[in-house]
């Protein structure tokens, strides 16, 4: 199994290293990740500029590649032949430092990296660990348990390669617990967030007005069967996700609007 591994926290993130160690037990892994933190970039790509890649020695002595672009760029580079003779069978993105649940997944560079697997025609898995703070804001006081979900992902990758239908990825989220405290895993649907941000005006030293808008943690609706509910019950959540955003249930209703009459000849 040939695995391309990426993330959005950057090449030096500890979750990336934990994922690589586990995945190397089940396949050949090429690690290509952003050269800096790219959290929240979604499916953005690099237009009108070159992508630069440099070999980087990782904390365990292994070799990875640091890319100047986004997680999507990283996956596309490997798919197009950046590493001679290597064509990925599956994409794994993560392990993200912080959960990617519910409505938040459309913001996520981690999930976007896995979604690019659909574009290149292979299965994909996005993996995140629910932590108190994102990696770039961590203060080192929170104990992090990447290894349980890393091992789970390595086992899941084999199943996904064999059985996951085309056009679909798996979004995996794990509570930050040691393996013996996990209550298993559950197949879930995406939950629903509600956001509590405020508009706060600030001024820099030159008097220029700016705004702080992402300042309060989001909440979520308590609903059974969701990814949120799984984590609250100390379980790993696995949610199937596809790239086609068409609201098929809304097609018939929209057809009743007779929008053709809006075109004036």
UniProtKB/Swiss-Prot annotation:
Protein's cellular compartments: Cytoplasm
MF-aspect GO terms: 5'-nucleotidase activity; metal ion binding; nucleotide binding
Cofactor, free-text remark: Binds 1 divalent metal cation per subunit.
Main location: cytoplasm
Reaction equation(s) it catalyzes: a ribonucleoside 5'-phosphate + H2O = a ribonucleoside + phosphate
Record: residues binding a divalent metal cation: 8-9, 39, 96
NCBIfam families the UniProt entry points to: PRK00346.1-4, surE
Obligatory cofactor(s): a divalent metal cation
Family according to the record: Belongs to the SurE nucleotidase family.
InterPro entries: SurE, SurE-like_Pase/nucleotidase, SurE-like_sf
Designated gene of the protein: surE
EC number of the protein: 3.1.3.5
Organism: Rubrobacter xylanophilus (strain DSM 9941 / JCM 11954 / NBRC 16129 / PRD-1)
Biological role: Nucleotidase that shows phosphatase activity on nucleoside 5'-monophosphates.
GO cellular component: cytoplasm
Listed name of the protein: 5'-nucleotidase SurE
EC top class, as a word: hydrolase
A Pfam family the protein falls into: SurE
Keywords, alphabetical: Cytoplasm, Hydrolase, Metal-binding, Nucleotide-binding
